[in-house]
Amino acid sequence: MDTAQKQRWAITLSYDGSRFYGWQKQAGGVPTVQAALETALARIAGESVATTVAGRTDTGVHATAQVVHFDTAAVRPAQAWIRGVNAHLPEGIAVLHARQVAPGFHARFDASGRHYRYLLESAPVRSPLLKNRAGWTHLELDIGPMRRAAALLVGEQDFSSFRAAGCQAKSPVKTIYRADLTQSAGLVRLDLHGNAFLHHMVRNIMGALVYVGSGRLSVEGFAALIQERSRLKAPPTFMPDGLYLTGVDYPGAYGIVRPQIPEWL
C-alpha cells in the first residue's frame, strides 16, 4: 500500500449467515458476505476495494462483531463507511463501527483472540422461530457433564480431534482461554474464547458435547477424545445454524472496541 495516497480502515460488521454462502467470494456470483461488502464499499469509495477479514465464516455461520480492514484513496468520514455503506448492503449485513487505523494494521494477523458463541435448542420439536438462529437436538441434555467436559478444553492443546479434514491451519495447537456453558429456558449457550480456532472446531466441539449431555459419551471419554488427536473417532460435525462469531480482540493501541454480545443472543 502507498501510505502517501491510501488510508487503511477497520470496520466491524454483523451478518446473518443463513442468507449467504459464507464469507469468501466465490465464482459464479453466489451471494457471499465479502462480495456484498466489497460492492457496497466500492460505491462509497468510487473505486474497487479489497477486504481482509479477521476470520472467514462458513455458510450459515453468523457474526455479531466481525472485523475487516481495507485500503482506499477515497477520503471519507467514518459515518460514510457506516451509514453510506449500509445503504448499499443487502438485508442481512450491517456495518456497526468504522475507524481509520495505522497502515500496518492487519485484521487477521493482529488479532490476539476470537470469541464464539454456539446457541443450541434442546427440545422434542424444533421451534420454527429459531430455525437458522440456533442449532437443535431433540435429545434431553444433562448440563452438568457437558460443563465438566467443556472445562477440559481450557489451555494450550492439540485440537486435531475437532479439526475439519480440509483445515488449512499450519498447526492444530491452539489455546482456549475460556469455555463456559450455560442453560436457560431450553437454550444452551457455549461461549469459547481462544487465540485462534481450527476449521469447524467449534461445531465439532458442540457435536461432542451433545454426545456427552445425552449420555452417549462420558466426560472421561471426551477427555480421551482430545488426547486421541484424531477426527476419526469423534462425533459428527454439528449444524452451523447456532454458531456466532461474537468478537475479535486486538491490542489496545489500535482502538478497536469489541461490542457486547446482543442481549437477544
Curated annotation (Swiss-Prot):
Entry keyword tRNA processing: yes
Subunit-structure text: Homodimer.
Protein name: tRNA pseudouridine synthase A
Signal peptide feature range: none
InterPro entries: PsdUridine_synth_cat_dom_sf, PsdUridine_synth_TruA, PsdUridine_synth_TruA_a/b_dom, PsdUridine_synth_TruA_C, TruA/RsuA/RluB/E/F_N
Keyword Isomerase listed: yes
Family: Belongs to the tRNA pseudouridine synthase TruA family.
Enzyme Commission code: 5.4.99.12
Catalysed conversion reaction: uridine(38/39/40) in tRNA = pseudouridine(38/39/40) in tRNA
Keywords from the UniProt entry: Isomerase, tRNA processing
Residue numbers annotated as active site: 58 (nucleophile)
Residues involved in substrate binding: 116
Gene Ontology BP terms: tRNA pseudouridine synthesis
Function: Formation of pseudouridine at positions 38, 39 and 40 in the anticodon stem and loop of transfer RNAs.
GO MF annotations in UniProt: RNA binding; tRNA pseudouridine(38-40) synthase activity
